Amino acid sequence: MLYLLPVGAQQADGFCLMEISDSIYMRIYGKSFKEDCTTSRTDLRYLQVMHYNKEGEVCRGELICHRTIANDLLAIFKELYEARYPIERMVLVDEYNADDEASMAANNTSAFNFRYISGTRRLSNHSRGLAIDINPLYNPYVRWRNGKRMVSPEGAEKYADRSLDFPYKITRNDLCYKLFKKYGFTWGGDWKNSKDYQHFEKKWVE
């Protein structure tokens, strides 16, 4: 689905950054922006970016994130686009009714979503728009419970084996990893007690 940009949006070569307009707010309210959302609408920004998929096709993507990381994300995705780095899909998680599992299973890259960390009652950094998940199906969230490995999303179990070669895989030698680290993000693949290979986040610093 194609969405028209509001008048006055800052654009350059298919990339734009803007405040949350009324039309965008209508798309997210009650979904990623839930009624009890503690993140202010004014703290969020809407981004449109260009990206390639693994077939080399040019795609238009969109994200919502916290204002403090918006310029960083815009710069990162411009560099990824120039390098033809493959990202399969990038639409608002609201297209999946803010269902994180469904979005991940579709290998959809997304950022803001007011939700809890999978398997817990703690708010995720996605709730403030300070985290982003890149190509999540191929870079799953892996944790252990009572000695049993748990992999999210469902269907991503084979991609939890990081010794294998497959498309969209993020490693420390990967351009995506290097760019996010360059801009001060931390990677979930470096966590000790669990691994979230899709996940990059940044602390809120004004």
What are these regions (language model features)?
Residues 10-57:
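N-terminal module-boundary/linker segments of secreted carbohydrate-active enzymes
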Residues 3, 76-80, 84, 180, ...:
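Hydrophobic, Leu/Ile/Phe/Ala-enriched alpha-helical segments that form helix-helix packing faces
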Residues 87-88, 102-136:
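Mid-length scaffold segments of soluble, non-membrane domains
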Residues 2, 39-44, 105-107, 125-127, ...:
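A generic structural signal for short, non-catalytic loop/turn and secondary-structure boundary residues
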Residues 39-104:
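Active-site acidic/histidine clusters and adjacent loop/turn architecture
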